[in-house]
Amino acid sequence: MAEWIPVFLMPNLRVAHDITVDEMAIVPSTDERLQAYETKHPQFRQFLQKFTDPFGARVSPGVLLLRSDAPETFKSIEAVSSFRDLLALSVIPFQRAKGTVHDGSHHIQYSDYFDFYPWVYHEGHKHLVCNTPAQVSLHEIRVFRGQTSPILSALEFDHIDVDSPLLNALLQRWRIRYGTKRPQWSDRALFRSLNMAAAASKMPAGVDLTTFSLGRNIGLWVSAFEILTHTG
């Protein structure tokens, strides 16, 4: 029987409204689709409950889910990351526009909110594993203490934060792109561009912000548009 499998946690994203297609979803940690998995893997629930902000306030991470019966083409890290990227770019330009019009910063304006947490639950080991370019590690859930990013304010993500027509169009293209092993160049280019745009949408720096930091992000935006205009 097919089930929903948690792939990554997103502790910077306080999800109040799920984003779902047949193969994948981003949901709040209280979503009923997690119940069957948590019954089989109670250690995962423990992991989910061990997140706070830097001052100890409890945080409920967003969860990216994958359907166990999804075609293999949807199970690659590229497909998962592209799903995250399309959501981020359906939110950030829209929220930056709202922030400009209404003269406020209380909006999700940076893609750091959509970052995947590097430690994940491993069903075989019943432990946490981390596999990044910098480290490959395994550790106990018992001693884990997860935190949100200290450079981000606590903001809730809801359906009103999304440019819905853009999101629906990108979800349709995502299913076309990853529904085949031989995608069209235009579909490959779109999601390469979105990935570059997601990088360009990160905070340019923390407390060490300079004009160099801003210039770096501008360069990434230029690359995102160049990818789209390339003919292949």
Language-model segment annotations:
Residues 1-219, 223, 227:
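Charged, non-catalytic interaction/linker regions at domain boundaries
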